[in-house]
Structure formats: structure tokens, C-alpha cells
Regions:
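A residue-level structural signature of the nucleotidyltransferase/glycosyltransferase Rossmann-like core
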Residues: 9, 47-48, 139-140
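Nudix hydrolase/Nudix homology domain
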Residues: 23-25, 62, 103-105, 112-178
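Intrinsically disordered, low-complexity, charged terminal extensions of DNA damage-control enzymes
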Residues: 8, 58, 175-177
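Acidic, metal-coordinating catalytic segment for phosphate/diphosphate chemistry
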Residues: 2-38, 44
Length: 178
């Protein structure tokens, strides 16, 4: 697989059947449904690790969101993709498990649209991450009830997909402490 494959997403139908590939920016410009994943890392206190997206990101720079998210590569499992991206963005890896999947659509002010068949992956980690500054501006641990309160008070500080996932699926996302 060439380096350019990093810039492609897997187009899917509403049942997650592959329909080909498309360059990532083009898929977001055309609001094409594509496969994605969102990683949620909890510590032993059941706090969620949030990241603030790097200010250089092409969409939603500087907004708070889940631990990491991205797109699977062709032939890559959801878990493999989640572990790869967790290492690339946050500088660590841990065991992950799939919880739920769903489709969402979120348009942005810059004309791009996230339209994703999103897999939610959860894991546990109790150390500080070593974030990649090209991907992550900041990070923090937060209790779910504090996230819920802050999203209501300051919705513009969070990514649209995180607000959608959190509101609709927060009860299914929680990983019981080990």
C-alpha cells in the first residue's frame, strides 16, 4: 500500500458494504458515506480522555473531542485501525473493544461534511499520553457528567460528531472499570 492510501477513505452503503474508495477531502466535500472509527479511552476512575484538535487541522481545529478518530485503511480491522491511530495521535496503544456502530452526518461551516458509518471503540489507559503536536493541541481527563454539563454550557467548544455520539450513545460507550 502506498503512502497516498493514507488520504483515501472507504466508501460504504448504509449496511457498511464497501462501495470503493475516494480521496478523503473529496469525500468530505461531496458528503459521501464512508467508514470511520472513534476511540474512547477511559481511566480506572471511569474518566474519559479528551483531546483538543490541533489548530492546523483542515476542519474543526482547536475543538475538543473524543480520544481520537480516523478512517480505516483497506484490509485493516476496526481494532487495528483504532490502535494505529491511537499511537499516531496520542503516543500510546492499549486493548480496544468494539461497542456500537451507527451512521451520522455533520456539515461544517467550511463546506465540508462528515458522513460516516462510525464504529465506537473503547479501552482503558491510566498513564499520560504523549500527543503528537501535529494532531493534538491539548488533552485532559473528564468525568462523563462534567462533559455533559460542559457540552450544554459550551457547545461550540466540541466537535459535532463528539456531541452526536455523546448525546445518543453515552450509556453504551461507558467501559466498566476493570
Amino acid at each position: 500500500m502506498t503512502n497516498s492510501s493514507n488520504n483515501y477513505v472507504i466508501l460504504v452503503d448504509e449496511n457498511d458494504n464497501p462501495q470503493g474508495t475516494m480521496e478523503k477531502i473529496e469525500a468530505h466535500e461531496k458528503a459521501k458515506l464512508h467508514r470511520a472509527f472513534s476511540v474512547f479511552i477511559y481511566n480506572s476512575k471511569n474518566e474519559l480522555m479528551l483531546q483538543q484538535r490541533a489548530l492546523s487541522k483542515y476542519h474543526t481545529p482547536g475543538l475538543w473531542t473524543n480520544t481520537c478518530c480516523s478512517h480505516q485503511k483497506i484490509g485493516e480491522s476496526n481494532i487495528e485501525a483504532g490502535k494505529r491511530r491511537l499511537q499516531e495521535e496520542m503516543g500510546f496503544t492499549t486493548d480496544l473493544q468494539e461497542t456500537i456502530s451507527f451512521i451520522y452526518k455533520a456539515p461544517f461551516e467550511n463546506g465540508l461534511t462528515e458522513h460516516e458509518y462510525d464504529y465506537i471503540l473503547v479501552g482503558e489507559y491510566n498513564d499520560d499520553p504523549k500527543p503528537n503536536p501535529e494532531e493534538v493541541n491539548d488533552w485532559k481527563w473528564m468525568k462523563l457528567e462534567d462533559i455533559e454539563t460542559d457540552i450544554k454550557k459550551n457547545p461550540s467548544l466540541y466537535t459535532e460528531w463528539f456531541k452526536i455520539i455523546f448525546e445518543k450513545h453515552k450509556n453504551e460507550m461507558v467501559k466498566s472499570p476493570i
